From Swiss-Prot:
The gene is okaG. This is Cytochrome P450 monooxygenase okaG. Its cofactor is heme. GO terms for biological process: mycotoxin biosynthetic process. Disruption phenotype: Abolishes the production of okaramine B and leads to the accumulation of okaramine E and 12-deshydroxy okaramine E. The chain crosses the membrane at residues 3-23. Nonribosomal peptide synthetase; part of the gene cluster that mediates the biosynthesis of okaramine B, a prenylated indole alkaloid that possesses an unusual octacyclic ring system, including a four-membered azetidine ring and an eight-membered azocine ring, and that exhibits insecticidal activity against silkworm larvae. Within the pathway, okaG acts as a 2,3-diol synthase that installs 2,3-diol on the okaramine scaffold to convert 12-deshydroxyl okaramine E into 3-desmethyl okaramine B. It is a single-pass membrane protein. The lineage of its organism: Eukaryota, Fungi, Dikarya, Ascomycota, Pezizomycotina.
Length: 538
């Protein structure tokens, strides 16, 4: 199964053709920052934007080496977002900890996701419930959720990888997609929905169309966005109706039982700990009764899938390829298997939250894969919303109101000055405290200068040294105040998947690792690859 579906390809091609026909001949807006990717030619911005569909990540690396390593921001053309200012690593922490009144993330994400076109109900798509569920509820309940998720993932492996002792080939992307989706929905809605193949497939398809459709809408001229947006909305509506058909009975029953429990506290029913219940409880707590209906709750459930499935599935797939394509002589597999088998035995053959915390080498192997194979070449998009802009004169940083910024994630991750032998997969890299400290020092060091936003300096800003943690040793989960709220659950699920594989399966070394394809800022597994596996005799 390819990440780019036929529909996604059609939508992207349509946006490009319409852009060629209707984009005006534009030139870049004046800026103090150097530009990378433009040529001296007619319709330079349009033509640069079109080339960015396959050259953006190359330009990001070019600009990083030429400018960012000297702490100079630079500007890239982008088909889906227009000019983007790329921020050097040493300036990132200062910028990304600015208050939301200076640097916006919510409206930027809504623009990236094209919420106004792809969501039939704007309120749940634009409020903070997704982040509240991920950050507050799931993270808070990880200790109780981990054994349940582990059990479901083990069942998924039995189903998709099998229990045969003979070697067999499996499609990496397809199996990762199914296993990850089932594991996520164990937390979101529980059984039986987390095992409903039609429900899970519709969630997968919806998340794919959402990503591809949003990119196509962003790339189209404003005048024509309603056409592409209408097409994407129509397909998303069909897929949503499919998921709702499978989930509405569960949601309806939950609404009825919750109402009965609220009316009569002695009612004999214990609410499940899952996202459906957290959504219902949150709507009651906020007195948001207009959203307390089956359709809206089903839609909120789908949105949680949309933000979870694609990136986690991608990360699991690249983890398996990076690990099993590494030279066996390096001893990664032996060390990882010994660690997982030891912890699994000590925990009585049950994966618990405390057991997973002991998997230090396993966590390092996962983080190293996230470093080596980021979801995008650039990321962490934000928009300057301070009317006076943001400036750092000593470093020629001048960001007017409305400027879109991003970070050169892949370029930083492949910088040998930060990560020695950066092109190599080293499963032990993040298990070495001294190596992690050195990475933190490189990424968190700040220039001795103040950022000006036309007002008082942000008093909540703290020194990098006092607030640094391992999540800032690399940028897979972001940086600053809006770091990924679901990162703890992602690490739990990825640890479980890798540990279950190492304990229960043999995997032949991967001789050919498919290269990720650049599609704008995304890294796309066009050819997902295969693994040859068999169930271990233990």
């Amino acid at each position: 199964m390819s990440l780019i579906s036929p529909l996604a390809a059609v939508l992207s091609a349509m946006a490009i053709v319409l852009g060629l026909l209707f984009f005006p001949n534009m030139t870049p807006q004046p800026t103090l920052h150097p530009r990378v990717g433009w040529r001296k030619e007619k319709a330079s911005t349009l033509r640069a934007a079109l080339r960015s569909c396959y050259k953006l990540n190359d330009w990001a690396l070019e600009g990083y080496n030429a400018y960012a390593k000297l702490n100079i921001p630079y500007v890239l053309p982008s088909f889906d977002r227009g000019p983007i200012t790329i921020i050097p690593a040493r300036l990132m922490r200062r910028l990304y900890t600015l208050p939301d009144t200076d640097l916006d993330i919510r409206m930027t994400q809504q623009e990236t996701n094209q919420t106004r076109w792809v969501a039939w109900d704007k309120k749940p798509a634009e409020d903070t419930f997704v982040w509240d569920v991920l950050r507050k509820q799931i993270t808070r309940n990880l200790r109780q959720l981990t054994p349940i998720v582990a059990s479901e993932i083990e069942l998924s492996f039995n189903r998709w990888w099998g229990t045969d002792k003979e070697w067999k080939s499996i499609d990496i992307w397809d199996s990762c997609w199914k296993i990850v989706t089932g594991g996520i929905n164990t937390t979101l809605c529980g059984s039986p929905l987390c095992r409903d193949a039609e429900f899970l497939q519709s969630c997968q398809n919806h998340s794919l169309v959402l990503v591809a459709g949003a990119m196509a809408i962003n790339g189209a001229p404003r005048l024509l966005q309603p056409i592409i947006g209408g097409l994407v909305w129509f397909v998303c509506a069909i897929l949503f109706n499919t998921t709702m058909k499978r989930s509405k009975a569960v949601v309806q029953e939950r609404l009825e039982k919750t109402a009965m429990l609220r009316a009569e506290p002695a009612y004999d029913w214990k609410p499940p700990q899952d996202a459906i219940q957290w959504i219902i409880d949150d709507l009651y707590a906020s007195d948001n009764l207009t959203q307390l209906n089956v359709k809206t709750i089903c839609f909120r459930l789908l949105l949680l899938n949309d933000v979870s499935i694609p990136s986690t599935s991608f990360s699991v797939q690249t983890l398996l390829l990076n690990l099993f394509a590494a030279d066996p002589a390096l001893g990664f597999l032996e060390a990882l298997r010994e660690e997982c088998q030891t912890v699994y035995t000590e925990s009585g053959g049950v994966w618990t939250y405390d057991a997973l915390k002991k998997l230090k080498i396993t966590e390092s192997a996962i983080r190293e894969s996230l470093r080596l194979s980021p979801v995008g070449g650039i990321g962490l998009h934000r928009t300057v919303v301070n009317p006076k802009g943001i400036s750092l004169p000593d470093y020629r940083l001048n960001l007017p109101h409305g400027t879109v910024i991003a970070s050169p994630i892949e370029s930083i991750h492949y910088d040998d000055d930060i990560y020695p032998h950066a092109n190599d997969y080293n499963a032990f890299r993040f298990a070495d405290p001294e190596a992690v400290r050195a990475i933190l020092d490189k990424l968190s060091s700040e220039p001795n200068s103040n950022i000006s936003t036309g007002g008082p300096r942000d008093r909540e800003s703290k020194s990098a040294a006092s607030t640094a943690n391992i999540d800032e040793a690399f940028l897979a989960f972001g940086i600053g105040k809006h770091i990924c709220p679901g990162r703890f659950f992602v690490m739990v699920e990825m640890k479980l998947i890798l540990a279950i594989i190492l304990v229960h399966y043999d995997v032949k070394p991967v001789k050919f690792k498919p290269k990720l394809v650049d599609c704008l800022w995304l890294k796309v597994p066009w050819n997902s690859g295969t693994l040859v596996v068999r169930r271990r005799s233990n």
